[in-house]
Structure formats: C-alpha cells, structure tokens
C-alpha cells in the first residue's frame, strides 16, 4: 500500500481539467515521409494561456469517419525528439512531454535540452516542488490530457476503443491521462515511474532517480491516479524486480490500487529497461 494520497487529490485534478479550453488545432503540418499507407501530421494544440501541446497524428489513408480505434503513446524522461507511431485500423497520437516543436533543428533541441535540464527535480533554492501548482509535471499532464481530448473528438475515432500506453515517465503520464479522461478501454504500461512517492519514509526502497519527496509531489503519484481508473479500463503492467528507478514495491502499490481488470508481469533481474 502506498502513502495516503491528499484528501483533495481528485478535487485538485478535476478542477484543473475543468479549466482546459477546447482542444483546437492551432497548426497542422503534414509529415513528408509517413509509413506506407498512412497519413501523418504534426499537430499543435491550444492550451489557452499555457504553452501549447505537440503530437504526431497518424492514421490509415482513406479511413472513413467513425471507423478507427484510437491509441495514444507517451514517452520516457528526457528532452528528445519523438517519433510517430503507426497502428493498423487506428488513429494514433505520439505525444511530446514538453511544449516543444517536433521538427526543429539540432540547435533548437540543444537549446531546449539546456533549458529543461533536470526538469521536475527540485534544485537548490528552487521552490517548484514545494507548491503543487508549480510542479513541472502539472502542465505536462494537462498537455497530455489535451491530446487525449483531441483524439476523443477526432471524427475518425469509433467512440469505443481507446488504448493508452507508455513506459517509465510515459507510464506515469499514460496512467494519469487514463484516469482523467475516463474513456480509456486499455492501459498498457511498463516500468511505471513516480509510484509511491515518499515510500522511502515508510522503510521501502527509494528510487535512484526520482525527485525528493514533498507534500506537493503527492499530487503527482502514479498510484493515486491508478486508483481513479474507470472500472471498464483493462490494465496491463510490466515491471522489473531489479529496477531501482521504479522499485517493485511502488509498482506493487500501483497494482493494488487499481480497481479495474488488471494483470502484472514482474521479470526477475529486469532493471529499468
């Protein structure tokens, strides 16, 4: 069992969701070399007064409205270029964790890496992780959710099948979005990060790569989002018994918090990979 979540956890996040503007496309650029048989675009989504969200949108050519499943993938920690995904009979989004152009120059990404170096981690003299409103992951998750809201409004979606996936930081994002969007039918996550934040204060193994515990970070615990998952969402988890970044104690707390249909595969000696 994880540390107790804040009493107003759901209220906090529901209030953030309620402030999101419509997920309108501010800019759409066609990908020059998508996979054969697919259309692909870079999309920039409106976040109102906050920085926009960016994602790759792909779907099979000549698809008719209302006929496609939907899939969303989120990515691991870092400030790196991402790639589109191509899934049969599916309209898909590959979502950038940051408000960052997807077709920038090498110099642009170098600058972004310097700007976002150590994001999410409290630095000396920095109060970011002392205030739940200022935690870097707040706007990250809201951008992630806006991408999900976009695909749920996409006319190509069949309105039924929505699979959300991710690994490590991407698993944290995927779990949060599945919890907040309420319409995910499948959640597939591997080596999920930020589970049982502060568990080390109760004697559990500490992560070797996780922000130091603060009460504000309790609002960003993957376990608490997992407890909010819709009971119609089928959850599959893969994790490693040798993972010191996402210790198995935290992943087990995540599994135990889920009230939906679920399965977990722990692999002996698997580390954070």
Give residue spans per PLM region.
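Glycine-rich His-Gly loop
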Residues: 47, 73-78, 97, 240
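A short, hydrophobic beta-strand element of the alpha/beta-hydrolase
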Residues: 73, 94, 187-190
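Cap/lid segment of the alpha/beta-hydrolase catalytic domain
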Residues: 82-87, 91-142, 199-201
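N-terminal targeting or regulatory segments adjacent to alpha/beta-hydrolase or S9 domains
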Residues: 1-39
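Short beta-strand element of the alpha/beta-hydrolase
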Residues: 54-59, 66-78
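The feature captures the conserved acid-bearing segment of alpha/beta-hydrolase catalytic domains
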Residues: 198-258
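Histidine-bearing beta->alpha loop at or near hydrolase active sites
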Residues: 261-273
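Primarily recognizes the serine-hydrolase "nucleophile elbow" in alpha/beta-hydrolase
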Residues: 145-208
């Amino acid at each position: 069992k994880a540390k107790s979540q804040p009493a107003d956890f759901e209220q906090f996040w529901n209030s953030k969701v309620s402030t999101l503007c419509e997920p309108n496309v501010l800019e759409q650029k066609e990908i020059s070399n998508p996979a054969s048989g697919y259309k692909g675009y870079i999309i920039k989504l409106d976040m109102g007064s906050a920085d926009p969200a960016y994602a790759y949108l792909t779907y099979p050519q000549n698809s008719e409205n209302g006929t496609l499943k939907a899939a969303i993938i989120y990515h691991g920690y870092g400030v790196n270029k991402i790639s589109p995904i191509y899934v049969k009979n599916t309209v898909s989004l590959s979502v950038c964790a940051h408000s960052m152009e997807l077709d920038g120059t090498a110099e642009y990404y170098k600058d972004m890496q310097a700007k976002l170096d150590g994001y999410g981690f409290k630095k000396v003299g920095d109060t970011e992780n002392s205030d739940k409103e200022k935690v870097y992951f707040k706007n990250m998750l809201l951008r992630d959710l806006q991408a999900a809201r976009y695909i749920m409004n996409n006319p190509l979606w069949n309105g039924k099948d929505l699979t959300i996936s991710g690994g490590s930081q991407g698993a944290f994002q995927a779990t949060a979005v599945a919890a907040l969007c309420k319409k995910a039918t499948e959640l597939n996550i591997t080596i999920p990060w930020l589970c049982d934040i502060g568990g080390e204060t109760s004697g559990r193994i500490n992560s070797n790569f996780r922000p130091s515990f603060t009460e504000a970070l309790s609002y960003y615990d993957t376990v608490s989002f997992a407890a909010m998952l819709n009971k119609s969402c089928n959850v599959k988890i893969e994790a490693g018994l040798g993972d010191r970044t996402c210790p198995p104690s935290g992943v087990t707390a995540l599994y135990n918090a889920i009230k939906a249909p679920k399965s977990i595969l722990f692999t002996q000696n698997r580390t954070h990979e």
